[in-house]
Design a protein with these regions (language model features):
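Conserved N-terminal beta1-alpha1 strand-loop-helix module at the mouth
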Residues: 1-70, 126, 208-219, 233
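Catalytic beta/alpha-barrel core
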Residues: 10, 31-39, 58-66, 82-93, ...
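Catalytic cores of alpha/beta
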Residues: 20, 68-79, 117-129, 166, ...
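Glycine-enriched alpha-helix->loop->beta-strand junction motifs that scaffold or abut catalytic
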Residues: 26-30, 53-57, 78-83, 103-108, ...
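Alpha-helix-loop-beta-strand connector modules within alpha/beta enzyme cores
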Residues: 40-64, 97-115, 151-173, 211-234
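Generic structural signal for helix capping and beta-alpha/helix-loop junctions
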Residues: 41, 69, 93, 119, ...
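Glycine-rich phosphate-binding active-site loops on the catalytic face of alpha/beta enzymes
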Residues: 81-93, 134-146, 188-217
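Active-site rim beta-loop-alpha module in soluble metabolic enzymes
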Residues: 115-166, 174
Length: 234
């Protein structure tokens, strides 16, 4: 499987999200994510605007669904999303409902193991319930709280190989990764590389001489796309 680059549009304004998305697509980004802040601020309008502007591009709606699984997934599918996100900590029936909506509306389901006491078991459970992808996720508040207590901040890379080995579906690692770490994810067997807003501006190794963000993103995409993901041959 060829590595995929996804940009998380964690913005709160449609116009800004569309400008960033256009820049990202020109640079070679494969998937767009309507991030949770964009969905909270703009709702279905944000997803519809992305679909209207980028008709052939996969769009992930990061709903973080916890209940009302079928309706939420259905609404996002009708707005133009191709992928929706459900949380492993949701009730099993909610996950099943999202998966059913995905099948009914031709939308892929990404299961997020954020907050699971056993992250590997959470990933496996998501796969067993029918999720098409697993997001291995260390949350923002989790990382901040642990660091504030003077402990080592956890990283999704800590257990990424274990998660990848536990499931057959593609895995994405999210949460506090530096740009260089995100680019390394395919070498752990995780082919879906997500770039959050901070990652596109803070990595010196990928900044162009004139600070051109599009040029930097192009270098990042080339670095990811040039890799071969261990364990994936398709």
């Amino acid at each position: 499987m060829k590595p995929i680059v996804q940009i998380s549009l964690d913005l709160t304004n449609i116009d800004e999200a569309l400008k960033t998305a256009a820049l990202a697509i020109r640079a070679g980004v494969d998937w767009l994510e309507a991030g949770t802040p964009l969905i909270l601020a703009e709702g279905l309008h944000g997803v519809r605007a992305l679909r209207a502007s980028f008709p052939g591009i996969p769009i992930v709606a990061d709903l973080k669904t916890m209940d009302g699984g079928y309706l939420e997934a259905e609404m996002m599918a009708q707005a133009g999303a191709t992928h929706v996100v459900v949380m492993a900590r949701a009730h099993e029936e909610t996950i099943k409902c999202v998966v059913k909506a995905g099948r009914d509306h031709n939308v892929k389901v990404m299961g997020d193991n954020l907050g699971c006491p056993d992250m590997v078991a959470g990933a496996k459970m998501l796969e067993d319930l029918g999720c098409d992808y697993v997001i291995h996720h260390i949350g923002y508040d989790d990382r901040r709280g642990i660091a504030a207590a003077g402990q080592r901040m956890p990283s999704p890379l800590d257990q990424l190989r274990e998660v990848v080995q536990a499931v057959k579906v593609p895995v994405q690692a999210v949460g506090g990764l530096t740009l260089e770490q995100a680019i390394q994810c395919p070498q752990y067997g995780a082919p879906l590389v997500v770039l959050g807003a901070p990652l596109t501006v803070d990595a010196d190794a990928f900044k162009t001489a004139n600070g051109d963000l599009e040029g930097s993103l192009r270098l990042i995409c080339e670095a990811v796309h040039s890799q071969v993901v261990p364990g994936f041959t398709a």
